[in-house]
């Protein structure tokens, strides 16, 4: 049973890089288990009306929910899931008063609706929502769920299943008995119903009812058990967002689908003849009328294949009065606008709605007043600096301040900023050597909680004054085993690819390297490819682990270069969308080669002992390196990589020529392959097929397969096993290459 578990940790009001350095820790080479000894926090949330936080911790495979309340913010473990069994814990949500936290146990479903079962439990997997009281007591299971929505008062969890809306009662009596256990629908309506948004007082639930060619915004009244639709039309309405007082809803409206984009089965009704009436969206076809000549020309006329509003624009923002259901448009972009026409989500903030758009090199956030006074969106964030997505932003409880993180002025890190949602000059809250992400304001308005890290401190929960300053760390306290004084500060080095493009890299140099020594070296290539490695611990779990791995490799004596190749993020849209990458020409591989040649040029690197490793897209580039340049790379570790683009085997096809499989005849270097066979990101067949190519050419390979596991293994023990195998493999084929 779960209990409240205080965690020994005090607020440390110091900068992240000001850390103790006990000399006793440096007596022997550290292990990866020691590097991973601190718990890894993520999914930070804050109550709106109480100074209380909640988050998820992954600690040696054990996934639990934690909380901390002001003013001391002492961390407390709320749950007791103490097995390294691969059962994920995610999606925490906290009630406005901070009394209830819900969370999901179980991995997300794949396309077949099957959850991950990495421990191969004979009971099979499930994905269920649980609840726990922050005051203490055992967590309890509510039932199976996909994406739960907790009411602000913490009484109800709503969710969609099979296109209908269901609910669980968190508090007894919150729902009628036949609905409270998720067995009978809360709302049984036509179409596909989802996008659930609770009103601020928790008495109403807004939802999107998609109906193919059109869609509605629905409102379910919990007390009256009544559904109403806001200004129903032939158009497609999405992204409902509530005003602070709960009396109005803003939403996005796009034109309904024209005949030429509709797809519907004939029902022999009037205007709907037997057979397929229209083809797939965007492929207008003749109806299935007997005798219609094959290849007959399609009709052409305005409004048949594309749809616009009067005035020529394709998207508009509307606001509705919830009581009356009446609505009106309050803003639309110019006709054929290429930037704002792509907006698909808005959030009510202050007197307007805010949204993200990418007009140039960087994603920016804008506001439009709901009263319709503004003719054009007002930019809130600058036209420089990388904001990854809306997930890296949050609003103050009153909606008057936007908090976000970006890399403005410090392109290799992230820092937190704030700006009024009515417009004004952005103000930095954090600076310096740290990496601060996912800002979440505390209800009292005095502090902002962040995920914070630096080159030596792993990801932590920190509190920053709203006036700015260094994060005060509340979790985790670093274990004695954590090898902080074995770590190095990565250096930013620039390389130039064969086509002249400059590439940012991080260089990890062993602490004990001596003048005149030539060390073995490794290139690390991240996945994605829309990722950016930083000069410190990363905010994403695998890259947090990969940073620790690169530090560990440096502690083992390797020189490590982490390459931020083109098609990654952090350096602008032109870099992210660089031409001729991926299956269109593999241009990013030039950047990997440039990294290897840079290492070869260093006087402290043995040019004949360079290896490479990476996961996912990093595995893809590892396989490219070994297939195309076994003369540069003596060995590699390829975790869940892609080796053949698409399913075309034509040797003249560009995608095939861009694949590692096309160059496999040049593959001479040994490789360690690691893959889970329930990978939902990269098909396991990519590794199966590659092994056959390598066997046919007598290329040395070692293979680790994790049955029922996913893209990034969910079981800690498997990572430790993988690292042990990697250590032995690299020692044999890189450290001792040619010896």
Please provide the spans of the model-predicted regions:
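Hydrophobic beta-strand positions that form the internal "hydrophobic ladder"
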Residues: 53, 98-101, 157, 202-205, ...
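Short loop/turn segments that connect beta-strands within beta-propeller blades
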Residues: 69-73, 133-137, 170-173, 221-225, ...
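Residue-level detector of Asp-centered blade-edge/turn motifs that repeat once per structural unit
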Residues: 48-49, 96-97, 152-153, 200-201, ...
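Beta-strand-rich domains and repeat architectures in extracellular enzymes and scaffolds
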Residues: 33-63
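Serine-hydrolase catalytic core recognition
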Residues: 258, 313-315, 343, 350-351, ...
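A short beta-strand motif characteristic of beta-propeller blades
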Residues: 31-35, 76-81, 138-141, 182-187, ...
């Amino acid at each position: 049973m779960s209990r409240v578990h205080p965690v020994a940790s005090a607020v440390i009001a110091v900068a992240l890089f000001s850390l103790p350095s006990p000399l006793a820790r440096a007596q022997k080479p550290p292990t990866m288990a020691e590097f991973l000894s601190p718990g890894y926090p993520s999914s930070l949330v804050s109550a709106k009306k109480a100074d209380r936080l909640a988050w998820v911790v992954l600690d040696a495979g054990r996934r639990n929910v934690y909380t901390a309340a002001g003013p001391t913010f002492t961390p407390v473990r709320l749950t007791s899931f103490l097995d390294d069994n691969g059962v994920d814990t995610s999606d925490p949500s906290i009630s406005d008063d901070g009394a209830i936290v819900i969370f999901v146990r179980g991995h997300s479903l794949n396309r077949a609706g099957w959850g991950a079962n990495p421990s191969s439990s004979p009971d099979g997997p499930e994905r269920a929502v649980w609840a726990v009281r922050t005051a203490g007591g055992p967590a309890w299971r509510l039932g199976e769920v996909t994406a739960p929505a907790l009411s602000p008062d913490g009484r109800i969890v709503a969710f969609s299943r099979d296109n209908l809306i269901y609910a669980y009662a968190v508090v007894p009596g919150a729902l009628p008995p036949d609905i409270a256990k998720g067995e009978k629908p809360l709302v049984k309506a036509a179409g596909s119903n989802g996008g659930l948004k609770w009103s601020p007082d928790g008495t109403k639930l807004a939802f999107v009812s998609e109906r193919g060619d059109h869609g509605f915004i629905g409102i379910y009244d919990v007390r009256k058990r009544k559904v109403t639709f806001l200004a129903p039309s032939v158009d497609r309405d999405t992204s409902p967002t509530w005003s602070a007082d709960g009396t109005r809803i803003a939403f996005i409206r796009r034109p309904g689908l024209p005949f030429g984009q509709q797809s519907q089965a004939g029902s022999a009704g009037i205007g709907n003849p037997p057979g397929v009436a229209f083809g797939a969206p965007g492929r207008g076809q003749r109806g299935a009328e007997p005798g219609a000549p094959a290849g007959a020309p399609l009709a052409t006329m305005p409004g048949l294949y594309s749809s616009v509003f009067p005035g020529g624009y394709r998207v508009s923002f509307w606001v509705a009065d919830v009581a009356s259901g009446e609505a009106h448009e309050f803003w639309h972009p110019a006709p054929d606008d290429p930037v704002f026409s792509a907006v698909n989500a808005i959030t009510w903030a202050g007197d307007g709605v805010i949204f993200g758009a990418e007009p140039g090199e960087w994603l920016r956030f804008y506001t439009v007043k709901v009263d319709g006074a503004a003719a054009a969106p007002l930019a809130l964030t600058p036209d420089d600096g990388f904001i990854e997505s809306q997930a890296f932003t949050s609003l103050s409880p009153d909606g008057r301040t936007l908090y976000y993180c970006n890399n403005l002025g410090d392109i290799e890190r992230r820092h937190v900023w704030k700006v009024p949602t009515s417009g004004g000059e952005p103000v930095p809250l954090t600076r310096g050597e740290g990496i601060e992400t996912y800002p979440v304001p505390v209800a009292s308005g005095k502090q902002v909680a962040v995920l914070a890290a630096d080159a030596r401190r792993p990801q932590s929960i920190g509190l920053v004054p709203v006036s700015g300053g260094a994060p005060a760390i509340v979790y985790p306290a670093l274990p004695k085993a954590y090898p902080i004084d074995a770590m190095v500060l990565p250096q930013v080095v620039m390389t130039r690819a064969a086509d002249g493009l400059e590439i940012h890299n991080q260089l990890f140099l062993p602490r004990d390297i001596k003048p005149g020594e030539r060390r073995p070296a490794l290139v690390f290539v991240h996945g994605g490819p829309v990722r950016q490695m930083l000069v410190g611990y990363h905010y994403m779990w695998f890259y947090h682990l990969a940073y620790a791995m690169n530090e560990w490799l440096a502690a083992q004596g390797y020189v490590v270069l982490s390459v931020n190749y083109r098609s990654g993020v952090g350096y602008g849209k032109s870099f992210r969308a660089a031409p001729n990458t991926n299956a269109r020409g593999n241009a990013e591989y030039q950047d990997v080669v440039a990294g290897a040649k840079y290492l070869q040029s260093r006087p402290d690197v043995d040019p004949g002992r360079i290896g490479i490793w990476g996961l996912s897209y990093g595995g893809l580039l590892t396989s490219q390196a070994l297939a195309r340049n076994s003369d540069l790379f003596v060995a590699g570790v390829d975790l869940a990589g892609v080796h053949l683009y698409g399913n075309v085997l034509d040797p003249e096809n560009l995608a095939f020529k861009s694949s590692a499989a096309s160059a496999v005849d040049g593959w001479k270097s040994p490789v360690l392959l690691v893959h889970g066979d329930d990978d939902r990101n990269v098909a396991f067949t990519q590794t199966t097929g590659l092994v056959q190519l390598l066997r046919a050419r007598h290329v040395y390979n070692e293979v680790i397969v994790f049955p029922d596991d996913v893209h990034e293994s969910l079981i800690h023990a498997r990572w430790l096993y993988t690292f042990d195998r990697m250590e032995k493999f690299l020692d044999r084929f890189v450290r001792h290459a040619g010896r």
